[in-house]
Amino acid sequence: MEMVRLSKLMFTFCIAVLIPTIRGNISELDEYWSQRADEAREFTLQAYHSDPYEIVDHFHERHYDNSTDVTTPEEDGDAKPEEEEKEFIEMLGSSTNSTRRSLRGKGKGKWSKLKGPCTASNPIDKCWRCRSDWAKRRKKLTRCVRGFGHRTTGGKRGRIYVVTSNLDEDMVNPKPGTLRHAVIQKEPLWIIFKNDMSIRLNQELLINSHKTIDARGANVHVAHGAGITMQFVKNVIIHGLHIHHISESSGGMIRDSVDHFGMRTRADGDGLSIYGSSNIWLDHISMSKCQDGLIDAIVGSTGITISNSHFTHHNDVMLLGAQNTNEADKHMQVTVAYNHFGKGLVQRMPRIRWGFVHVVNNDYTHWELYAIGGSQGPTILSHGNRFIAPPHKPHYREVTKRDYASEDEWKHWNWRSDKDVFMNGAYFRQSGNPQYKCAHTRQQMIKPKNGLAVSKLTKYAGALDCRVGRRC
């Protein structure tokens, strides 16, 4: 108990020192932003788990709830424990060694040619995808999140807000019906889209707390403009967006709340930027071709799950912790699960400083330099992933890359691999305690599927073509 108190005290000190000195894209840290930063510090402390292994267990826990508004195992197709071995064998039945993905077309009709019963194959998707009435039960999605973001509820307690316009013309007084007008509201909101649309953001989109952006039922692209920022906020869900061709923006006067706007400096061109924020869930997102990173989570952000997403054509994919001197990221906790890291990716899938990251059942079919990297002694648990090394680059077959440390230092970092599958000569250089075992109980833990199964587990990664009245 004393160690836990000491850990939280040190974390509070790190955050207190850090927040006044790092402003992100805020031109002037006025009273409003100072208050937001103070609140973010408290949110981060609340979201931080002193025993992260408990959340690793929670990720694999099956939730059976007898309440009337929860999908039962029979409804969502969840296998009973005695059926798991049979299910796993069936999952291995078709081309597990293939690196090709059968996407059956592009864009609007991506999944329309799929025939037969719904085949949601991972626990998050099983929770909701195979129900034809999902549109009437949108907010039940919050029951499906797992991992470190498991407390995230987004706009569950708010009303539905329908985005009717793709325009983004006024940064200070956005028009009702636009995405920018929706995300700056102070109240919880569940944001959906009236129809298919492509939104070109003229400046970074600043999301307020307690929001869900739910693109199910429409084909929504945020593209060819600025990216999306979550700064000093909590409790945000982003689901089903296509985010691509994001470029840097010049900054200027931008409204971030109904009662505040201020001067923002240049934004680097990240697709999704999580800055000093907590309880964030990113699910079923398709991302590519952003000027800087696809996803950045920095400055003490924690309680994050990134799941079921598809990443392609990018250099610096995912950065978790941006500075070697920023000890506020020491308690960053992130789950990366059921994602497909696909064509045209180079590195950082993810790249971690300081934090604790659970990388589970992801499919790494392409990289150019390395897949998972880090510095400053992060803890990385790699469970049940498939790593396929680049066939044309024999010198880049190592999955891992350690920076800014000699072997005498990094050999103590706890980077462990279990149930991973390696192809084309790929290998994971482990470090830390070779006898390390994550504490699992039968009540809490379902072990990760073997890496051979990830082609099935990640088959529907990325934004889905969900249509009202039909299964996704």
From Swiss-Prot:
Could you tell me which residues belong to the region Disordered? 64-83
SUPFAM superfamilies annotated for this entry? Answer: Pectin lyase-like
Which co-factors does it depend on?
A: Ca(2+)
Key word Acetylation present: no
Write the Enzyme Commission number(s) for this entry: 4.2.2.2
Q: In which pathway does it act?
A: Glycan metabolism; pectin degradation; 2-dehydro-3-deoxy-D-gluconate from pectin: step 2/5
Presence of keyword Lipid metabolism: no
Query: What does the cofactor section's free text say about binding?
Result: Binds 1 Ca(2+) ion. Required for its activity.
Question: Catalytic residues?
Answer: R348
Its keywords, alphabetically, are: Calcium, Glycoprotein, Lyase, Metal-binding, Signal
Check the UniProt entry and state the signal peptide residues, or none: 1-24
Listed GO molecular functions? metal ion binding; pectate lyase activity
Which InterPro entries does the record cross-reference, listed alphabetically? AmbAllergen, Pec_lyase, Pec_lyase_N, Pectin_lyas_fold, Pectin_lyase_fold/virulence, PEL
Instruction: Please give the residues the UniProt entry marks as glycosylated.
Output: N25, N66, N97
**Superkingdom, according to UniProt?**
Eukaryota
The UniProt entry's GO biological process terms, in alphabetical order, are: pectin catabolic process
Per its record, the protein catalyses:
Eliminative cleavage of (1->4)-alpha-D-galacturonan to give oligosaccharides with 4-deoxy-alpha-D-galact-4-enuronosyl groups at their non-reducing ends
Give start-end positions of Acidic residues composition bias.
72-83
* Residues binding Ca(2+): D268, D292, D296
Family designation: Belongs to the polysaccharide lyase 1 family.
Q: What is this protein called?
A: Probable pectate lyase 19
Species per Swiss-Prot/TrEMBL record? Arabidopsis thaliana
